[in-house]
């Protein structure tokens, strides 16, 4: 019996991956891109600290599957971001990893060719190159930190990160978040509960030690200082929205009870829109109204937006993909995005400077 194999019984294969250090040497961060990342992070810190009166708005596709469409979108968004910059800090949503309740396409890093070949190394190259290109435009980026290893490859290009509703309760993701170099938004649970996000904020503010990889790709003990810029993202749940003024007030109370900063972001999509993109602009209007009525705690917004409306399934023949249309959640189109953000800017431009920090 001594020759019996006892490990890797269900592992089909293993292959080495490029190290974070090597990827960064191949695709280095330029001075302009680094400035964009740093300025974006600091602006979000200042908004959360009450030093900057603006709202920060994370807007972009539900997920990235076509880098050319993403670049086209980024050029348009940069122009709009400059136009509304006195009132809104616009950050582009650049999501490469998609959590799955069961199975499905897991995102550009995991399967960049959309054909179940899982060319992860190519996915990391494609993803980092896109993030660098967007940063070169002067547009900060945001992503979801889903895989605890990929931040070592990409986090130097990111100004804001999210932890999703399915992973906010995960100890692994809380530990990772305590060491990330930017503000982190924790979504409430898929059932709508706030406790998981509030507890996550408490956890990540403290130092942690855990297993990870270093820049040379070696397994390492990671020791963190803690991250004091965690905040709640209200995304609805349990079949109900939670962006209304009563839900926001309940969130404020929960944060106050936990002695945490009252810094709230509202996700206009997911359960807050019943996954109907047409509802997202209505959520933006409601948040605008709450701020006009005196709300002080809402500091950020998230909008799922693409070049074109709706979504599509990934076809067997990838040539049949519609350009600029999401392959995951349905998004609002560019024209709707422009109108919604311009309307918000016009209504809040004279109000936000008078808002208390």
Language-model-detected regions and their locations in the chain:
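Active-site-facing alpha/beta catalytic cores
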Residues: 2-8, 74, 87-243, 247-248, ...
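N- or domain-start disorder-to-order transition segments that initiate the globular core
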Residues: 9-49
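Domain-level signal for soluble alpha/beta catalytic cores
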Residues: 11-22, 29, 96-102, 107-121, ...
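Gly-rich Lys/Arg/Thr-decorated short loops/hinges at beta-loop-alpha junctions or inter-strand turns
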Residues: 20-28, 224-238, 321, 325
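Conserved phosphate/anionic-ligand binding catalytic regions in large, soluble enzymes, centered on
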Residues: 56-69, 329
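Conserved, mostly hydrophobic/aromatic
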Residues: 60, 266, 333
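Histidine-anchored nucleotide/phosphate-binding helix
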Residues: 70-83
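Active-site or pore-adjacent capping/gating segments
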Residues: 292-357
């Amino acid at each position: 019996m001594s020759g019996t194999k006892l490990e890797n019984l269900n592992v089909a294969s293993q292959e080495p991956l490029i190290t974070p250090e090597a990827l960064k040497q191949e695709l280095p961060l330029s001075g302009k891109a680094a400035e964009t990342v740093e300025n974006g992070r600091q602006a979000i810190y200042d908004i959360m600290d009450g030093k900057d009166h603006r709202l920060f708005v994370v807007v972009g596709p539900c997920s990235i599957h076509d880098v050319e469409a993403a670049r086209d979108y980024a050029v348009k968004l940069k122009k709009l971001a400059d136009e509304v910059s006195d009132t809104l800090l616009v950050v582009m949503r650049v999501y490469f990893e998609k959590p799955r309740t069961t199975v499905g396409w897991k995102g550009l890093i995991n399967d960049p060719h959309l054909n179940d070949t899982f060319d992860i190394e190519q996915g990391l190259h494609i993803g980092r190159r896109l993030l660098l290109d967007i940063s070169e435009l002067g547009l900060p980026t945001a992503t979801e930190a889903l895989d605890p290893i990929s931040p070592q490859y990409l986090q130097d290009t990111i100004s804001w990160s999210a932890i999703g509703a399915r992973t906010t309760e995960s100890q692994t993701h809380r530990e990772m978040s305590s060491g990330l170099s930017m503000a982190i938004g924790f979504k409430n649970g898929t059932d709508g509960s706030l406790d998981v996000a509030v507890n996550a904020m408490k956890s990540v503010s403290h130092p942690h030690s855990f297993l990870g990889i270093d820049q040379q790709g070696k397994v390492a003990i990671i020791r963190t200082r803690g991250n004091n810029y965690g905040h709640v993202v209200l995304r609805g749940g349990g079949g109900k929205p939670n962006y209304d003024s009563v839900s926001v007030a309940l969130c404020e109370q929960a944060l106050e009870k936990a002695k945490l900063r009252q810094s709230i972001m509202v996700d206009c999509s997911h359960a807050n829109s019943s996954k109907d993109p047409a509802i997202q602009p209505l959520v933006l209007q409601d948040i605008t109204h709450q701020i006009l009525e005196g709300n002080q705690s809402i500091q950020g917004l998230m909008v799922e937006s693409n070049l074109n409306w709706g979504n599509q399934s990934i076809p067997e023949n990838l040539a049949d993909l519609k350009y600029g249309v999401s392959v995951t959640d349905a998004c609002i189109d560019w024209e709707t995005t422009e109108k919604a953000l311009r309307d918000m800017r016009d209504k809040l431009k004279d109000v936000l400077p008078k808002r208390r920090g």
